[in-house]
Amino acid sequence: MKIAFTELSWHDYLWFQQNDKKLLKRINLLIKAIARDPFDGIGKPEPLKANLSGYWSRRINSEHRLVYTIADRDLLIISCRFHYQR
């Protein structure tokens, strides 16, 4: 499975690299879990609705969510910081 980041999600990921190594480890763990099974596993995966229909979310912690989509067996990470404001 190919893993790609949007420009915004890459900036989020880099922010965690510089500011919160513990949550960075959690994000990496979630990415590995998504690669194994995109719709089941840790982080309470849930399909998003309304304008985010087609995207999925997993909990990083109570403040942050990993938002992603799967296309042709490839993972595209939309955001990994905060909830769904963007």
UniProtKB/Swiss-Prot annotation:
The keyword Zinc does not apply. Keywords: Endonuclease, Hydrolase, Nuclease, RNA-binding, Toxin-antitoxin system. One of its GO terms (biological process) is RNA catabolic process. Pfam families: YoeB_toxin. It is an enzyme of class 3 (hydrolase). The active site is at E46 (proton acceptor), H83 (proton donor). Its EC number is 3.1.-.-. GO terms for molecular function: endonuclease activity; RNA binding. Gene3D superfamilies: RelE-like (3.30.2310.20). It comes from the Bacteria. NCBIfam families: toxin_Txe_YoeB. Belongs to the YoeB family. Forms a complex with YefM which inhibits its toxin activity. Toxic component of a type II toxin-antitoxin (TA) system. Has RNase activity and preferentially cleaves at the 3'-end of purine ribonucleotides. This is Toxin YoeB. It comes from Synechocystis sp. (strain ATCC 27184 / PCC 6803 / Kazusa).
